[in-house]
Amino acid sequence: MKPLNVIFAGTPDFAARHLQALIDSEHNVIAVYTQPDRPAGRGKKLQASPVKALALENGIAVFQPKSLRDEDAQAELTALNADIMVVVAYGLILPKVVLDTPRLGCINVHGSILPRWRGAAPIQRALWAGDSETGVTIMQMDIGLDTGDMLLKTQLKIEDSDTSATLYEKLAEQGPSALIEALAGIAQDSLPAEKQDESLANYAEKLSKEEARLDWSKSATALWREIRAFNPWPVSHYEHEGNTIKVWQSHVSDETSSKLPGTILSADKNGISIATGEGVLIITQMQLPGKKPLSVADILNSRADWFTPGTVLTSTDNQEA
């Protein structure tokens, strides 16, 4: 197999792990594209992306255009004369002229089994929907949003204990090896492309903080899925006397209740049991304002008065039943 001359485009840690796999492979990473440095931390100093930092460590040329619609940026990319461009969580739109520039086009590593979840938040939406599996898709990019032909797919069972954080880690481990396998197939022209079935497609839009507000009229199962999907961001929450209480971990109880949704049924070291629209949810890890996430057992040692059985939680504040 003849090694490919690769341009890599990506920004966060998830992307950097794929870049590392490329650096370790027989292919040649001739340039890296990443988003411009952003202010970060308390001092708001400009900070390089994980992808840029890794590229510089390995002596790879870095390009940081604000847009790839710019003709000068496009001319720079063309001059690199790449065989292929690998795109992983880059964050910039690639116009058609860019997609067509590398000899073999552009491929993308997408964190779901397409076409089930297209868009920005496939990991979170898969959890929220109660999917039993997810995976990674290596896709030939076209001008649509995650609509290109599929080149390779992996599968990963979603466990009951999984959150967006744990799935992110698992897919960050699966993705790099899938990418290298796909590149081998592309280099040998032995990887058949599969069209996406449009009837199976859903759009995984970016999460919002508003969506993370817990609605106790939903079923315990739905709330449990939401809490897992919103961990680690933006974190499911409810209000108590004007304070935002974040919920990090929970599970569905075998109990049933005829109490009003949002009613605290019990509170002890094993968790806080809350009646929902259907079933009972047990919260086991929470975060009080200005504090770090703690087990319910630890929180009850200091704030048991906030979790008195009989209290009814609403989507805006608490009321005594």
Curated annotation (Swiss-Prot):
Catalytic EC class: transferase
SUPFAM superfamilies xref list: FMT C-terminal domain-like, Formyltransferase
Catalysis: reaction(s): L-methionyl-tRNA(fMet) + (6R)-10-formyltetrahydrofolate = N-formyl-L-methionyl-tRNA(fMet) + (6S)-5,6,7,8-tetrahydrofolate + H(+)
A Gene Ontology term for the protein's cellular component: cytosol
Binding site for (6S)-5,6,7,8-tetrahydrofolate: S112, I113, L114, P115
CDD domains: FMT_core_Met-tRNA-FMT_N, Met_tRNA_FMT_C
EC number per UniProt: 2.1.2.9
GO MF assignments: methionyl-tRNA formyltransferase activity
Function (record text): Attaches a formyl group to the free amino group of methionyl-tRNA(fMet). The formyl group appears to play a dual role in the initiator identity of N-formylmethionyl-tRNA by promoting its recognition by IF2 and preventing the misappropriation of this tRNA by the elongation apparatus.
Entry-linked HAMAP family: Formyl_trans (MF_00182)
Name this polypeptide is given: Methionyl-tRNA formyltransferase
